Structure formats: C-alpha cells, structure tokens
Amino acid sequence: RAQDDPQYRLEIGAGVGVMTYEGDFNGNVLGDMQPAGFLVGRYNFDPYKDLKLSVGFGKIKGSSANVDTFYPDYAENPYSFNHTLVDMNLVFEYNFWPYGTGRDYRGAQRLVPYILGGLGATYVKGNEKNVFTANVPLGIGAKYKVNERLNLGLAWTFHFSLSDELDGVKDPYWVKSSGIFKNTDCYSTIAVSVTYSFSAKCKTCNKEE
C-alpha cells in the first residue's frame, strides 16, 4: 500500500552533553568531562544518508599532575588549564538501516545506528593565547523517531585537531614532531539531541516501486 507519512528534507534542533580533552595532560578518553551544548541542523538526502551541521560550545580541562608522563618543565609546578572551546562541524551520516516511522518509507525503522565523518573548525580561548584550527570529526551514533516530526539522537564523536596547543602548550616532551596528526590534541563529545523535521517531500515519491 502507499506510505501515509511524508518524508522530510530538513531537521533543526539542539542538544546537551559532555566534552572531554585528550592530549598531553589527559590520557583518559572519559576523564575530566565538562558540560557542553549543541545546535544541530540536518539535510536528509534519503532514509539512509544525511548531512549534519553542528555548532558546539563547552570546556576542556587537564593537568600534568593527572598523567604518568614526566614533563621536565612541570616537575615541580604542575601545569593545569581550563579553556573554552567552540566548534563547527559538517559531517556526513550514514544509517545502517532506513530511518523513519515505517509509514513514510517501506522498511524504515524508528531506531537506527549510524556512522559519521567530516570536517570542522575549532576555536579555543585560552588563558594566554587563543587557538583556531581545523578538526576531523569521526564517530558513531543512534537515532530514534519519536513521531512523524520529532527525533531523538545520541552521538559519540572524536575530533582530531590539527593543533598541539588546545591545552596551551606545544611539545611539552621537548621532542619535535612532524606529520598532519603527529602529537596533536584531540577532544571528544557525547551529545543527546532533539530535532524537529520540516519541509516535506512529495508523498508519491515515497512509494515502493
């Protein structure tokens, strides 16, 4: 039979979660979690694929006292930081199964896992200097279709930055490095989001051929 619910091209919403720095002064991927907020927009190509634009705002922190590595400069006076981070990311998301209510696209599932990857920009406001750099976001997530227009999302994303100074310190080992991601700082985000779907596609395009 014909599908009853329309598919939607666009989503807009917001989310909350945590942000964690991973670098020279924190070796634990889940250590020193800080609160974060997000704005989210999506363009849905079809029930499998979409493009997401997100803006995140949060904090990153770390300390040389919390790692086992010996840093000559901080042997007597440990270094610590607490910086503000803002980023913008454009990522491609691929759902493992078609996403929808099941009444908009034949075979669609309300709950689907997905993978994501893309490009982003990161700005960090430090105590002594600010850093602006690119990042490469890679992650996994899941979406749940509450109803025709309301969506819940959960995503865990790793952001591989091109800078070693998100923490305010460059080369604390006194060892020069080379390569695009060699000894650079990273951060991760875990976000729960709510989005609203709008801009319906033509219903007749959603029928099974």
List the predicted regions and their residue ranges.
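Residues that define the transmembrane beta-barrel architecture of outer-membrane proteins
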Residues: Y8, G31-P35, T84-M88, Q109-L111, ...
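Residues on the lipid-exposed face of transmembrane beta-strands in outer-membrane beta-barrel proteins
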Residues: A14-V18, L39-Y43, L90-Y94, G117-A121, ...
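Predominantly the C-terminal beta-signal and adjacent terminal strand-loop region
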Residues: L85, N147-E209
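Outer-membrane beta-barrel translocator domains and adjoining extracellular loop/strand segments
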Residues: D24-V29, S64-F70, R103-G107, G126-F132, ...
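Short glycine/proline- and aromatic-enriched beta-strand/turn motifs that initiate or cap beta-hairpins
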Residues: A2-N44, A191-K201
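Outer-membrane beta-barrel strand-turn architecture
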Residues: P6, Y43-P47, F96-P98, Y144-E148, ...
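Gram-negative (and chloroplast) outer-membrane scaffold detector with strong preference
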Residues: P47-E128, Y196
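Outer-membrane beta-barrel domain signature
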Residues: V18, D24, G37-F38, Y43, ...
